[in-house]
Design a protein with these regions (language model features):
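Outer-membrane beta-barrel "beta-signal"
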Residues: 78, 197-210
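Residue-level signature of outer-membrane beta-barrel architecture
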Residues: 83, 126-128, 168-170, 208-210
């Protein structure tokens, strides 16, 4: 019984630690700008600097990472809308802007099943603009996800997902910039149905702004 209890605690500890890190990042992203800029400069409704972005890439889950048991490979297509919240935040190396990303990702599952998963993500993002052409950024958030795929261990079609990661934007042309991203991605049904074996994945994406 003691050994079993320790195993259960370890599984929950891994899941809770990942969730805690994600929530902590979101709190930083969402609250920091309010302390760094004057409220008069906030442009919550202004969409003049908003833009559309499109990304594509590859993702893979790793058995043994947390409670993940299946190796699931996906081709990811991610159209998204980037809404500027605060511009010209901070100074020096951390000068940048704060935005909200709204994504409608399509995950084309290529293994072990051939099917799709579709989600809706709301991500907080901070982009560093001190560099001349390269602009790194951090992001985190999540949302609902529906799975058409038959993946062992996923006991529900409706799931939740959260993710966080880092990326870089490179100035190519006046209206088209190159995007490169690496992100951690978690999918589970939150215990609403059994079985509930989550997918802990890494994803690499490239894209363009327009």
């Amino acid at each position: 019984m003691i050994h079993r209890s320790l195993c259960v605690w370890k599984r929950h500890a891994v899941g809770n630690s990942v969730g805690t890190v994600c929530v902590f990042l979101l709190i930083i992203f969402l609250l920091c700008p309010f302390f760094l800029v004057d409220s008069a400069r906030a442009a919550m409704i202004d969409t003049s600097k908003d833009r559309w972005e499109a990304l594509a890439g590859y993702g893979q889950s790793f058995p043994g990472w947390g409670e993940t048991t299946q190796r699931v490979e996906t081709i990811d297509l991610v159209p998204r809308y980037n809404h500027l919240i605060f511009d010209d935040v901070g100074s020096g190396w951390y000068r940048g802007f704060h935005s909200i990303l709204v994504e409608l990702p399509v995950h084309v599952v290529v293994s072990p099943d051939v099917s799709t998963m579709i989600g809706l993500n709301f991500l907080a993002c901070y982009t560093f603009t001190a560099g001349e052409r390269w602009h790194p950024y951090l992001f985190g958030g999540g949302g609902p996800l529906y799975s058409f795929a038959d993946i062992p261990g996923m006991g529900a079609d409706w799931n939740g997902n959260y993710q966080f990661g880092l990326g870089a934007e490179y100035d190519l042309l006046e209206k088209h910039n190159l995007l490169v991203e690496f992100r951690y991605h978690h999918i589970s049904n939150g215990g609403s149905k059994e079985p509930n074996e989550p997918l802990n994945s890494c994803k690499f994406l490239i894209g363009i702004t327009f």
